[in-house]
């Protein structure tokens, strides 16, 4: 079994995927507009350029998306970037935070040399731990977060 991710955008799917392709090293393998589908009978003229389906591969992850009328930013899920260096974490944090909303600025934590949480300008929520975190049995671990200002802790 393989689990892929499907994101809904409110008219900016193409811009988001092109941005991710350029800055996250992804490769767009499919992008179709509503105007390119075979039967366009029910497609409003102002929606023909909207993305019906897009697919991008980022590393070993497949991310799919579409423009959906009335789509809202992600609120209860985060895409997580596991990066190889603090420098790469800082670079991508700056790019994804530009025009977005920062929930937790990039900083050192008890579990990572760099960690951040944000929503980019396209409405996608991201977490940035540079490397997979390691926890000792006695240290607290962040279990869940929603809304962003309320943390729930446990131990591992």
Positions of PLM-derived features:
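Vicinal oxygen chelate
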Residues: 3, 29-32, 50, 57, ...
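Core segments of cupin and vicinal oxygen chelate
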Residues: 7-60, 142-156
């Amino acid at each position: 079994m393989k689990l892929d991710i499907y994101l809904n955008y409110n008219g900016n799917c193409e811009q988001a995927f092109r941005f991710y392709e350029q800055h996250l090293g992804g490769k767009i393998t499919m992008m179709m507009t509503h105007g390119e589908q075979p039967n366009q009978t029910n497609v409003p003229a102002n929606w023909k350029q909207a993305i019906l389906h897009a697919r991008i591969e980022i590393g070993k992850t497949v991310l799919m998306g579409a423009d959906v009328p009335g789509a809202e930013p992600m609120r209860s899920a985060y895409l997580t970037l596991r990066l190889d260096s603090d420098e790469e974490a800082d670079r991508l944090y700056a790019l994804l935070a530009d025009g977005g909303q920062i929930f937790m600025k990039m900083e050192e934590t008890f579990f990572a040399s760099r960690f951040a949480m944000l929503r980019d300008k396209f409405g996608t929520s991201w977490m940035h731990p540079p490397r997979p975190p390691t926890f000792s049995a006695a240290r607290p671990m962040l279990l869940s977060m929603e809304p962003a200002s309320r943390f729930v802790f446990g131990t591992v």
